[in-house]
Amino acid sequence: MAEGGYEDRELEELRRKKLEELQKKAELERQAQIAAAQRRIALKKILTPAALARLDNIRVVRPELAEALEQQLIALASSGRVRVPIDEDTLKEILEAVYSQSKREYRFRL
């Protein structure tokens, strides 16, 4: 019977650890959702509806580029380096700058 008690404690410890992992994961997901909602609110304030629609289209095709662009837009607007609201043409210019920074260059030697 002593072995059964040991196995029960071990099983309970495994369950407790798994529960902690799930709780941590849920908390991280919740924080990510809050951050995304805050970014969305900021973007709605600094972009025209047409520019926001273009950003949404970019997000569908290139999510990593859209995220970099969002960060750049929020930084530019908060520092006052760009006029708010940002229209679609200005967004295109910023997009070109961000895209050229994020584009990877590959070199092949033959």
UniProtKB/Swiss-Prot annotation:
GO terms assigned for molecular function: DNA binding
Transmembrane segments: none
SUPFAM superfamilies named in the record: Double-stranded DNA-binding domain
The keyword DNA-binding belongs to this UniProt entry's keyword annotation: yes
Cellular component GO terms held in the UniProt record: cytosol
InterPro entries: DNA_bind_arc, PDCD5-like, PDCD5-like_sf
Similarity section: Belongs to the PDCD5 family.
PANTHER family according to UniProt: PROGRAMMED CELL DEATH PROTEIN 5
Protein name per UniProt: DNA-binding protein Tneu_1679
